[in-house]
């Protein structure tokens, strides 16, 4: 686990303030819009997961709501547990495809079946 520096809050406020000035207050995944009153729920995600990589142009930052940020980091936890590969910004379920089986496909016939 990474060691959190003592001045982390100061570092975070620096890049957070910059990111909020650069990007619109919208979650990069779910497109939820934010206003000043709920801005604390909008977080800055480091795309490469390196919190020391803070370029002035914001190219390593992405604004995510709390829920999407948790989801993004949970993919890496699952990858560590199950040995899968995760590409930053991509959904782990992307290649799985849609479900093929429909349990209700023949429901009407099953309900009309006489005993």
UniProtKB/Swiss-Prot annotation:
Molecular function terms, GO-annotated: endonuclease activity; nucleic acid binding; zinc ion binding
E.C. no: 3.1.-.-
GO cellular component terms given for this protein: cytosol
Domain HNH, chain residue ranges per copy: 27-75
Domain of life per record: Bacteria
Pfam families: HNH
UniProt keyword annotations, A-Z: Hydrolase, Nuclease
Keyword field contains Mitochondrion: no
The UniProt record lists the keyword Transmembrane: no
Membership in a protein family: Belongs to the HNH nuclease family.
The protein's name in its UniProt record: Putative HNH nuclease YajD
Organism: Escherichia coli (strain K12)
Gene coding for it: yajD
